[in-house]
Structure formats: structure tokens, C-alpha cells
């Protein structure tokens, strides 16, 4: 476990987790949303220290237990595969078009011990021609880009990764998105 935070550490307003299939990333954010510290571990949802819910608790404690102790009132927010059917607790997909108030209204709460809860952000789903297209984690990145006004009210956001996404946004909502195998092709 990392060394405990010093008493001079800046205030933590949020502990954010990007919990994927093969890794877990944690971010300690200040009240303005700036990253104060970040950490990474190999404990994705398929690489937990032990199986089941206890494995998720252990992975969280191993990576950020000192943060949880130092900032007991800081909310915990997670996105990614942690909210899948194979994750800690399923956060059912929200259909597009969707704004981020719609996502916030569908957060799933998971107790993590010591009276704390973790909020899991649901992913997005689009049904086109009868086939589902999904994202988990990227919706949170899109919300950040929109909050920073990095994208106009009508735009296209590219999200590189194993399953790269191109999301169309309009008026603060994700209206459609496409998924590409680009990352898988390069990794092959």
C-alpha cells in the first residue's frame, strides 16, 4: 500500500475510479476537479485478488485504502466494466440519446465498508438495426469533455482504445456513437 497522505495534502473532493477489465485506475480530485494524484493497479474485474465482491473490496483497499482513511467524506465514483454484469454490481445501460442528468439519475450504489458507498456510472447503449452498441467508461470521459467545454454543443468526440469510439453529441447529450476494432487490430 502507498504511504499515507501527509497532513499538508490538498483537500480531496472526489475519489474517481476507472475500473476496466484488466486494470484499475484511481484519481484523487480537488474541488475544482483537478487531479491531485493518480494510481494504477492490475486489479481489473478479471484480475481481482480474490473472487467475488470481497475481491473488489480488497482491490480498492490495496490501491486507495489510505485515501479512504484520510478523506472519509470524499465520495467514491466508478465507471467502466465494474458496472457490467461481470462487475461488482451491474449498472444497467442507459439508451441514447441521453444527457448526463439521465446517467446521474441511474447511478448504482454499492456499500464498500466502514459506512461508505461507491457510486457506479451506467454505460450507454444504442440499438441500431436491431444490434446493440455499448460503451462503459467512455460516457464519463465524454461528460468531462462537455463539462470543460472542450466540445461545442454539436460535435464529434473520438475516444481511442481497444474498442475505439466516435460519439456524436448535441446540446449536452450523447445522441449516437460508433465502435471500431482499431485497438484490437493494432494489438494483434
Annotate each predicted stretch with a short phrase:
Residues 6-9, 69, 111-113, 147-152, ...:
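Solvent-exposed alpha-helices and their adjacent loops that cap or buttress functional pockets
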Residues 14-18, 75-77, 155-159:
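Short glycine-aspartate micro-motif
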Residues 14-55:
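Short glycine-rich, Thr/Ser-proximal phosphate-binding strand/loop in the N-terminal lobe
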Residues 20-25, 81-85, 159-165:
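Gly/Ser/Thr-rich loops at beta-strand to alpha-helix junctions
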Residues 30-34, 114, 168-173:
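Short acidic-glycine loop/turn motifs at beta-strand connectors
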Residues 46-48, 125-188:
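Glycine-rich phosphate-binding loop plus the immediately following alpha-helix
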Residues 53-67:
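Short, well-ordered amphipathic alpha-helical segments that serve as non-catalytic structural scaffolds
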Residues 67-135, 171:
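Short beta-strand-loop/turn "lid" adjacent to the catalytic site in phosphate-handling enzymes
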